[in-house]
Amino acid sequence: MEVKVLNINGKETGRKVQLSDSVFAIEPNKHAVYLDVKQYLANQRQGTHKAKERAEVAGSTRKIKKQKGTGTARAGSAKNPLFKGGGRVFGPRPRSYSFKLNKTVKRLARRSAFSIKAQEANIIVVEDFVFEAPNTKNFINVLKALGLEDKKSLFVLGDSNKNVYLSSRNLKATNVLTNSELSTYAILNANNLVLLEGSLEGIEENLSK
């Protein structure tokens, strides 16, 4: 598929780029997308939750009342989970939620995510640009020129560009990543995908394998 190349002023440069059909025009595999997003979100979890169980609650193990003759149910330690302040039955323990996913599935998921954005016509290709210094106002001007000021957008760079990244960091709806940092979640979480020309070769090289 062919896409027009714009400059940072939102004007057409008169050039077009050919996007690989094997990356941007496949039939999306929804299950692969589901698995990759699930893995990404699972990996974000700290898993540090912890509740004290019966043996871990502070306090005496003394039997709180005699076994018979009270007319009420038998009771042992005040740590019994039935009592207020007692331990929790099968409480949460610290654990890792991460799980492995084959590289083939991850690549398929990302190709599917790119294809979904292409089908929705939400991909913009912009010629490479740099800022001499971090400047949020300059980045906002780029968003305005591209019609993305109030939209959640993801800019994909070919190489790490510190000034461009720092210029966007204070913008809540804008995310800037290099092609090596891309995830299926990041692609789908953005309404619009802005691909800098320099990122295309790396994207297609990584995902065409």
From Swiss-Prot:
Gene Ontology MF term list: rRNA binding; structural constituent of ribosome
Gene3D superfamilies: 3.40.1370.10
Swiss-Prot/TrEMBL GO biological process terms: translation
Region (Disordered): 45-78
Regions that span the bilayer: none
Cross-referenced InterPro entries: Ribosomal_uL4 (IPR002136), Ribosomal_uL4-like (IPR013005), Ribosomal_uL4_dom_sf (IPR023574)
Keywords recorded for this protein, A-Z: Ribonucleoprotein, Ribosomal protein, RNA-binding, rRNA-binding
Entry GO CC: ribonucleoprotein complex; ribosome
Pfam families cross-referenced by the UniProt entry: Ribosomal_L4
Described function: One of the primary rRNA binding proteins, this protein initially binds near the 5'-end of the 23S rRNA. It is important during the early stages of 50S assembly. It makes multiple contacts with different domains of the 23S rRNA in the assembled 50S subunit and ribosome.
Protein family per UniProt: Belongs to the universal ribosomal protein uL4 family.
UniProt subunit comment: Part of the 50S ribosomal subunit.
Protein name, per record: Large ribosomal subunit protein uL4
